[in-house]
Amino acid sequence: MTLLDGKALSAKIKEELKEKNQFLKSKGIESCLAVILVGDNPASQTYVKSKAKACEECGIKSLVYHLNENTTQNELLALINTLNHDDSVHGILVQLPLPDHICKDLILESIISSKDVDGFHPINVGYLNLGLESGFLPCTPLGVMKLLKAYEIDLEGKDAVIIGASNIVGRPMATMLLNAGATVSVCHIKTKDLSLYTRQADLIIVAAGCVNLLRSDMVKEGVIVVDVGINRLESGKIVGDVDFEEVSKKSSYITPVPGGVGPMTIAMLLENTVKSAKNRLN
């Protein structure tokens, strides 16, 4: 069994981004990511801090806008509009979840597609579905693909199962795997018999937010397992959606949690931001 070490790969990517940023600075461009946080969700605050720290590590300027929980939708839209028209800002990220009185879809669509480094804008989703690399790809699925590529895992002809059908991970992940030549099944909350799919799979990607959802009796020998889940137990320990101890015994490759997909997600956010800055140069 080989661990898919996202922490090590993300560190390597950050070093490469440092060099790219030094080149851009020599041309008068400083990569800049604007992050908007609405409210005081503790998990969101932690994520925003980690993103700001990661930006600093590879020479990206980060602007954090921490807005009050009672910020109106129009006030948030006005800030995004200002950032859309600010040429010194190359990426805009709105930290989810948003308060209930704000429409998430409307907010995400208001970010200009050329600064949508999360890859959620309908235009960027369209590029992905057409198999084009013109736009930005969602960070978590992109991070998974880079991780698999780094370990020279050939996806062509693989039977792949994705557990979870969210717009953030499951759906774009399915499209990327399809574009890479895999045969893809997407399972979700209404799937009748999950094991029927997982037992036949060469590759399983789990993104459901459910502890121990994937157990060893549900997988075949030699399976490749990517665990996107992040769950905090009462003890404070962070675990994924996979029973790691048992499933790893049957896996050829598996991601740890933490240290697998999480660091890659942030690395891809940074990479998309630098890509946007480079587009400005071109």
Swiss-Prot record:
The lineage of its organism: Bacteria, Pseudomonadati, Campylobacterota, Epsilonproteobacteria, Campylobacterales. Homodimer. PROSITE patterns: THF_DHG_CYH_1, THF_DHG_CYH_2. InterPro entries: Aminoacid_DH-like_N_sf, NAD(P)-bd_dom_sf, THF_DH/CycHdrlase, THF_DH/CycHdrlase_cat_dom, THF_DH/CycHdrlase_CS, THF_DH/CycHdrlase_NAD-bd_dom. It catalyses: (6R)-5,10-methylene-5,6,7,8-tetrahydrofolate + NADP(+) = (6R)-5,10-methenyltetrahydrofolate + NADPH; (6R)-5,10-methenyltetrahydrofolate + H2O = (6R)-10-formyltetrahydrofolate + H(+). GO terms for molecular function: methenyltetrahydrofolate cyclohydrolase activity; methylenetetrahydrofolate dehydrogenase (NADP+) activity. GO terms for cellular component: cytosol. Catalyzes the oxidation of 5,10-methylenetetrahydrofolate to 5,10-methenyltetrahydrofolate and then the hydrolysis of 5,10-methenyltetrahydrofolate to 10-formyltetrahydrofolate. Pathway: One-carbon metabolism; tetrahydrofolate interconversion. Its EC number is 1.5.1.5, 3.5.4.9. Belongs to the tetrahydrofolate dehydrogenase/cyclohydrolase family. This is Bifunctional protein FolD. NADP(+) binds at G164, A165, S166, I189, I230. Keywords: Amino-acid biosynthesis, Histidine biosynthesis, Hydrolase, Methionine biosynthesis, Multifunctional enzyme, NADP, One-carbon metabolism, Oxidoreductase, Purine biosynthesis. One of its GO terms (biological process) is purine nucleotide biosynthetic process. It comes from the Bacteria. The keyword Transmembrane does not apply.
